[in-house]
């Protein structure tokens, strides 16, 4: 009996990870197979070969006839049957133990994560989810009341081990029938070589051995029936769960849709006040009035200001001229207003001055532009009488003719950009202003 202790300790683990029918099968295996085989069967088949007697004196004939009658001992055949039938259960136990260890590791990781979350929250107690509470309760329960659920790969392994047990049971029953039949006769006739003729051999305890054979075969049929019942039980359970799933899924979908609609309605309320940072992450739709109130960044004005400063540079002088011919700048409008207040000057003199200014601009280099003689100086001279004005104008004309050829190239480029305009229009504007003064 001590030889079966190792197998018995392993099969006890199967009891914790099996269904009710599986536990009944293990009970049948332990009590009606291992226990009886270890106690009574060995004594019944102990004198098997010594009590096998044949009516011949031919050497070797008795041994040959025994080998033909019993190719393998019944006890050894039943031992092999128990080992082969228990092997799928051992494989399942190995997978179940691995699964249990993985679950324990996962629970330990969840416990560590909960501890870290509680520490990060400043020692506040984190609410325990129902799943985590069930995990703690199941871990705190005793080993005897421990429940084990068959799901996923573990369920597949369990079904496979039942199938293999059934196949081994059927195989050994069929093999037993072809080897011995279902009973042992007291007389066995042998005609195998080296026997000279047909030899009669007699078997000891044939009735007792027949009873043991029938008992062991009945136990094999019971275990086979339990395997079939367990397969049908798991099949019915799977069918029931398959019928329950379509009813449960639409209910879950309806609950999710109702929660989604509630969340949308709460977002629509937040139209008249500024949302918090947490609510801005959830809300995705904003009114059109709020979109237009977005403040522009101060950086947007910088590139345009830099671009406006670069327009007045030397390489873009030609472009500035074309724009100044079409539209007057602020500087030109201010000069025109000042020229209206100037005293009248003869129109014939102004074109000559304009021609000289254009010649001075052509002589100037590309990076610098010449400027016409500022007309603001004319405004500063107060007009007292017409005669005094004429004398002053003639003196200014003489000075302009001398300075236009000498000082035009040395003028600063900043003034050229402001006063670079066609003189023909200035002369017309000045002549109109002077004519208005004369009429008054």
From Swiss-Prot:
GO CC annotation: connexin complex; plasma membrane
Compositionally skewed regions (Low complexity) per UniProt: 423-432
Cytoplasmic membrane side: 13-21, 93-161, 232-440
Intramembrane residue windows: 2-12
Region (Disordered) location: 111-143, 338-440
One example GO MF annotation: gap junction channel activity
InterPro entries given in the database record: Connexin, Connexin50, Connexin_CCC, Connexin_CS, Connexin_N, Connexin_N_sf
Compositional bias ranges of the Basic and acidic residues kind: 353-364, 374-399
Keyword Transmembrane helix: yes
Disulfide partners: 54-201, 61-195, 65-190
Bilayer topology: Multi-pass membrane protein
Tissue: Detected in eye lens (at protein level). Eye lens.
Pfam (any one): Connexin50
Record-stated family: Belongs to the connexin family. Alpha-type (group II) subfamily.
Name by which UniProt lists this protein: Gap junction alpha-8 protein
The gene coding this protein: Gja8
């Amino acid at each position: 009996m001590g030889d079966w202790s190792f197998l018995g300790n392993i099969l006890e683990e199967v009891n914790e990870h099996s269904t009710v029918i599986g536990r009944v099968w293990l009970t049948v295996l332990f009590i009606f197979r291992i226990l009886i085989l270890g106690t009574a069967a060995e004594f019944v088949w102990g004198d098997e070969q010594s009590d096998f007697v044949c009516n011949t004196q031919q050497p070797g004939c008795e041994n040959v006839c025994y080998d033909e009658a019993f190719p393998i001992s019944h006890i050894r055949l039943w031992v092999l049957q128990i080992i082969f039938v228990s092997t799928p259960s051992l494989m399942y136990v190995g997978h179940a133990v691995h699964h249990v260890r993985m679950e324990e590791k996962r629970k330990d990781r969840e416990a560590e994560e909960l501890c870290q979350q509680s520490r990060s929250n400043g020692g506040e107690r984190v609410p325990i989810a129902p799943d985590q509470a069930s995990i703690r309760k199941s871990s705190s329960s005793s080993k005897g009341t421990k429940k084990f659920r068959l799901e996923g790969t573990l369920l597949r392994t369990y079904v496979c081990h039942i199938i293999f047990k059934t196949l081994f049971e059927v195989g050994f029953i069929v093999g037993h029938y072809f080897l011995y039949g279902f009973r042992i006769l007291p007389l066995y006739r042998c005609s195998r070589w080296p026997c000279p003729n047909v030899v009669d051999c007699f078997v000891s305890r044939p009735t007792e051995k027949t009873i043991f054979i029938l008992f062991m075969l009945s136990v094999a049929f019971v275990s086979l029936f339990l395997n079939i019942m367990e397969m049908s039980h798991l099949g019915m359970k799977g069918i029931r769960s398959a019928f329950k799933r379509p009813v449960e899924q639409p209910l879950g979908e309806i609950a999710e849709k109702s929660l989604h609609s509630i969340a949308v309605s709460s977002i629509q309320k937040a139209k008249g006040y500024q949302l918090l940072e947490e609510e801005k992450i959830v809300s995705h739709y904003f009114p059109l009035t709020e979109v237009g109130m977005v403040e522009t960044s101060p950086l947007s004005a910088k590139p345009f200001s830099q671009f406006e400063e670069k327009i007045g540079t030397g390489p873009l002088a030609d472009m500035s001229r074309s724009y100044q011919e079409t539209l007057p700048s602020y500087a030109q409008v201010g000069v025109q207003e000042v020229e209206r207040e100037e005293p009248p000057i003869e129109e014939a003199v102004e074109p000559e001055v304009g021609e000289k200014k254009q010649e001075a601009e052509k002589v100037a280099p590309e990076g610098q532009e010449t400027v016409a003689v500022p007309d603001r100086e004319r405004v500063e001279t107060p007009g007292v009488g017409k005669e005094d004005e004429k004398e002053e104008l003639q003196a200014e004309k003489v000075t302009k003719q001398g300075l236009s050829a000498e000082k035009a190239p040395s003028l600063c480029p900043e003034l050229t950009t402001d006063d670079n305009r066609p003189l023909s229009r200035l002369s017309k504007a000045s002549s109109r202003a002077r004519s208005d003064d004369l009429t008054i």
